[in-house]
Amino acid sequence: MFTLERRVEQSKSWLALSPIMAIVLTILSGIIIFSVLDKDPWMSLYTFFIQPLTTGFGVTELIVKATPLILIGVGLSIGFKANVWNIGAEGQFTMGAIAGGGTALFLNTQESFLVLPAVLLMGILGGVVWGMIPAFLKTKFNANEILTSLMLSYVALLILSYLVHGPWRDPGGYNFPESEIFSDFAMLPILLEGTRLNLGTGFALLSVLIIYILLSRTVSVSYTHLTLPTNA
């Protein structure tokens, strides 16, 4: 008879192999899906994985699009280390963008070096406040944080859709759902001329290093409930 037992320690080999297995399974799943759709799976995988790396501009665009994902992953890793599940990163990122973008639009005519710090600060606060909602519901009403944080992501996307289709839509944007272009004072400095690669990538890499050092020196502890000691 077989029994399942919890590991005393995490397997280091499985920790190393898990990302590799995830990539392999993703590729195999893609091959199966494209084959079922009667599409060339190898050409599709080439377009997805290789083609963006064949030009310098493609590489920089890949880095630009990966930068917010890196920051999101770093933020989530802290909660996961404490066994706190947060499935609402997309919504928190979106609300941070709304708060920061709204600040940039409000200060669009201001020519001051203080505009960028204000935009960054409001972006952080927007994400924090949105993340506090499922935390409050969990502590006050014991609501499942996985469900509430996930559902709030859709709410955030609807708010963003309303803003870019309504009050924030650029009058000169040919009716596209987008805001006005932010002023240069609200934008991070460009690192490579002719691309969108900006200082945000440096911030993301620095945050990875800092959080790695923090988590590698931190013990994960979680509590499910508190009890009074019983007398012997």
Give each language-model segment a name.
Residues 31-52, 167-178:
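Interfacial/capping segments of alpha-helical transmembrane domains
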Residues 32-37, 47-107, 120, 124-132, ...:
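Single transmembrane alpha-helix segments in multi-pass membrane proteins
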Residues 1-21:
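Transmembrane alpha-helical segments of polytopic membrane transport and secretion proteins
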Residues 224-229:
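Conserved small/polar residues in nucleotide/adenosyl-binding loops
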Residues 23, 97, 101, 153-157:
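Residue-level recognition of pore/gate-forming positions within transmembrane alpha-helices
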Residues 149-221:
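Transmembrane helix-bundle core of multi-pass membrane transporters
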Residues 17-34:
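N-terminal signal-anchor transmembrane alpha helix
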Residues 14-18, 56-63, 88, 190-200:
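Interfacial loop-to-helix junctions that mark the boundaries of transmembrane helices
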